């Protein structure tokens, strides 16, 4: 059995980085994290009946009388058991003499995962029986007294990392799942990172931690919101999708620097890795520009970063929205690996290849390509067919695969239509080697880039399933993305505009004139923070001029300004220039811990359908309880219910 150690390391710092996030961690890691915040190690046994925790005992405690409380993790042949608490594991010797028969009975008959209290003496393990993999592996407890605090019924699953459980079963019995090493580590690391963020913001930089209301009013645009009925007929509160308006109002109120660990809510339906309620590190500052916000966040992450990971290197690189789309085909690129999109339009200006010629003859037409290193070695024919079918089905685009053989000769259906000079120029531009595969497409710029961006990730997945490591799991690659468009055409009516992010985002200073002539071309002062292909934060400089805010809302977005009259009125009373950002805490901790889902870093998450499987929530409410809210439930027909799911 492997006895992990994590709590003391979390406090005291690691002697070596943990390279595999999937390895069990216990005991010393938690201690290192607290120690890294320059605080003394907390006293875990104050105010309680135990004298020590299971994971803290060492050879320095030999001869001491101790009282321990915990769960029975494992028992062997009624001679010893392993006792577990949040701090770690310790071996307990079951007494065999008749004078201790009552103690033996308790410890031998209590089911695994029962809660017991034992008192005894710390002694050395017999020579040759030490366990170097276990932090307490040099000692054991010679028990004198024992008490069964609570017996455990038959478990729905074993609480061991190597025992596979379905996620539904884990969520149904979440209180048992929380006992696992990995969940303990995830939640304690989350707690310590938040503590260090508070320390950095409030103690070092003068931010004020302020709670904003949870009951608010419906906001125009943005994600769908949860409604909360009131006792006034036909009137509802709304759960805020972010404290956006409140934090701007705090700046108007002169608070200058605001911070909150904010609970937010979005009614987005069934999303595989989203939660209807989530947590963000919410920040707003007065008299700040984009550079100031970025520097603050870089320092915040550097200060709060766990010691068992490689340190955060600042400043983070920055790319514009146009650059990341052209290079990676997405606004949240994973920059841990290459396979960048290359524009090869100039090579084919005079081509005889039909679909390339057709694409280049149209406005914004382009020819793009990505190079899959050693793709000929790892990609199978069915993989290439799958890629081509995906391009046709989802993008209505054609993909042309080119295989490079020995001497980088081309193996492609169009090889005979490509001149030698074109072939050599492509090899130079794409920096290809033998056994590489080039995926080439042609079409409108944004569409071609988006397709290749999807295929870049798909091919990375394929290569990694075949043993090629492209994305180092220990590497954290941050990127700022800036200069987003301020508006996007509405999907349902492309002639109308909607905010690319939210309607309070200030336009780029160089593009303010475009609001009155060509608003579709206006850039915003919005910025996203991307980590390993995931957006972990987003913010902007806000509009602090009431007249400009009214113009954008009423004239460009066709929104009812009465719904935001409180904010517009506040901007009229001397609002300072201000800006802010929100970091998605759940997503950030998920990436830091290497967890497969954000549900693994939340104590009591919802399922992907938004259900709490432990308490069977949401639940129905009897009509008499709805009556004070003037609400009556009208159940949908079967066809409507099916569409809802």
From Swiss-Prot:
Changing residue 58 to G: No effect on its mitochondria localization. The lineage of its organism: Eukaryota, Metazoa, Chordata, Craniata, Vertebrata. Homodimer. It comes from the Eukaryota. It is found in: Mitochondrion matrix; Mitochondrion membrane. GO terms for biological process: aspartyl-tRNA aminoacylation; mitochondrial asparaginyl-tRNA aminoacylation; tRNA aminoacylation. The modification Phosphoserine is found at residue 242. This is Aspartate--tRNA ligase, mitochondrial. HAMAP family: Asp_tRNA_synth_type1. L-aspartate binds at residues 266, 542.
């Amino acid at each position: 059995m492997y006895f992990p150690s994590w709590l003391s390391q979390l406090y005291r710092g690691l002697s070596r980085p943990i390279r595999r996030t999937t390895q069990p961690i216990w005991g010393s890691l938690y201690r290192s994290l607290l120690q890294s915040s320059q605080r003394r190690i907390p006293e875990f046994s104050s105010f309680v009946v135990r004298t020590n925790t299971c994971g803290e005992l060492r050879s320095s405690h030999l001869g001491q009388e101790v009282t321990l409380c915990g769960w029975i993790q494992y028992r062997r042949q009624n001679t010893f058991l392993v006792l577990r608490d949040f701090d770690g594991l310790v071996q307990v010797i079951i007494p065999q003499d008749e004078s201790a028969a009552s103690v033996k009975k308790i410890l031998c008959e209590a089911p695994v995962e029962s809660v017991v209290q034992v008192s005894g003496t710390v002694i050395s393990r017999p020579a040759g029986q030490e366990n170097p993999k276990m932090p307490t592996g040099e000692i054991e407890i010679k028990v004198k007294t024992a008490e069964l605090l609570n017996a455990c019924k038959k478990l729905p699953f074993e609480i061991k990392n190597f025992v596979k459980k379905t996620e539904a079963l884990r969520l149904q019995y979440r209180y048992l799942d929380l006992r696992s090493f990995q969940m303990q580590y995830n939640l304690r690391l989350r707690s310590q990172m938040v503590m260090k963020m508070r320390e950095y913001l409030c103690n070092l930089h003068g931010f004020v931690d302020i709670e904003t209301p949870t009951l608010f009013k419906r906001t125009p645009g943005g994600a769908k919101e949860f409604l909360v009925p009131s006792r006034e007929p036909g009137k509802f509160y709304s759960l805020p999708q972010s404290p956006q308006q409140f934090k701007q109002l705090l700046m108007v109120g002169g608070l200058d620097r605001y911070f909150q660990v904010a609970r937010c809510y979005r009614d987005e339906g069934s999303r595989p890795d989203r939660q209807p309620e989530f947590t963000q590190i919410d920040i707003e500052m007065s008299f700040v520009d984009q550079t100031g916000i970025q520097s603050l966040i870089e320092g915040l992450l550097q200060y709060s970063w766990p010691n068992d990971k490689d340190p955060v290197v600042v400043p983070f690189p920055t790319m514009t929205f146009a650059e990341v789309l052209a290079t990676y085909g997405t606004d949240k690129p994973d920059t841990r690996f290459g396979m960048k999109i290359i524009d090869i339009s100039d090579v084919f200006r005079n081509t005889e290849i039909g679909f390339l010629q057709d694409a280049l003859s149209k406005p914004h037409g382009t020819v793009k390509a990505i190079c899959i290193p050693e793709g000929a070695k790892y990609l199978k024919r069915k993989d290439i067919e799958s890629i081509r079918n995906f391009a046709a089905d989802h993008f209505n685009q054609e993909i042309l695969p080119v295989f490079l053989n020995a001497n980088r000769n081309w193996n492609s259906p169009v090889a005979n239509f490509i001149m030698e000079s074109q072939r050599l120029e492509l090899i130079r531009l794409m920096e290809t080697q033998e056994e590489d595969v080039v995926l080439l497409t042609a079409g409108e710029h944004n569409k071609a880039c988006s397709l290749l961006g999807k295929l870049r990730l798909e091919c990375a997945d394929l290569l990694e399933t075949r043993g090629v490591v492209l994305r180092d799991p220990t590497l954290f690659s941050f990127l700022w993305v800036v200069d987003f468009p301020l508006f996007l055409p509405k999907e349902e009516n492309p002639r109308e505009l909607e905010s690319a992010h939210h309607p309070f985002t200030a336009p780029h200073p160089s593009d303010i004139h475009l609001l009155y002539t060509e608003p579709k071309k206006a850039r915003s002062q919005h910025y996203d923070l991307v980590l390993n292909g995931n957006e972990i934060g987003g913010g902007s400089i806000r509009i602090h001029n009431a007249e400009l805010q009214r113009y954008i809302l009423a004239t460009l977005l066709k929104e009812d300004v009465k719904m935001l009259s409180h904010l517009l009125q506040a901007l009229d009373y001397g609002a300072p220039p201000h800006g802010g950002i929100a970091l998605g805490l759940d997503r950030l901790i998920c990436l830091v811990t290497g967890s497969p889902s954000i549900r693994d870093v939340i104590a009591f998450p919802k399922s992907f359908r938004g259900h709490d499987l432990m308490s069977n929530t949401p639940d129905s409410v009897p009509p008499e309880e709805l009556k004070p809210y003037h609400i009556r439930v009208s159940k949908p027909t079967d066809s409507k219910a099916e569409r809802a799911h």
